[in-house]
Amino acid sequence: MNNIVKVTRLFDLLERLQVNYPKEDILAGKVQGVWRKYSSREYVEISHDYAYGFLEYGLQQQDKVITVMNNRPEWNFVDMGTALAGMVHVPVYSTLSEDDYRYIIPHSDAKIIIIGSALLYKHLAPVIASLKNPPAVFTVDPVEGANNLDQIVTIGRDNKEKWASVIEENKKNITPDTLLTIIYTSGATGTPKGVMHAHSSIVFNFLAHAAQQCKNSSHRYLSFLPLCLIYERTMNYEFQSLGISIYYAENMGTIARDLKDIQADGFCAVPRVIEMMYKKLEDAG
């Protein structure tokens, strides 16, 4: 493709999608059993709304935002919104112990924690409440008594004129060496450790692998490995860089159904997942 938009910072992917891969289903997730698809244009606009909203809420450059959620389009909106605003996304596994969360949240110095579901909120709320300086809490799904992430989107849209020029300046001034994310280990081998990654670290990896990718913008992938896992996260960006549609599985138990439903051209997996699939096929005869 001629005139492909160059990517050196994560948020450059948004311009590439809008210019080179304007499609109607770049991201999709299940909402009440129905696929909710997001176009390239929507992805760009919503990500900017998140950036405006974070700034209007009072966050500043290099402030940390934690997410604890399963794979869904909203993960990407937060991811790109924080990148555009010059903040640091800290995605955390949704399966950690209370002690791990009790360590990671203050250690990361997060100003906001975004929780995906009511079930996760129920698990995390007591932990957060026990902290000396707890971050503000928002949920993606509606949860009684909790702030909803839509509030951030709304104040972002309402204050676009106030913050649009700030974001445009960020696009000029944020360099590939700017801190983008902190990725914590799963804690399986001891206390979770936070690994700091600049834009360049992440971008180099997904562009290098994308050069070997045989699929293109006519294809769609199913995503189910946690996006806080660097492998899945890297592939998530790689697919976006090539305009490949990404559909997020409802949960680990719906993989087979979702693969069939969207007629997926592929997915990323680890040996354990392949072993589970093989056993199911074997048991089915």
Regions found by a protein language model. Give the residues of each.
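Conserved structural elements of the adenylate-forming
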Residues: 44-49, 176, 195-216
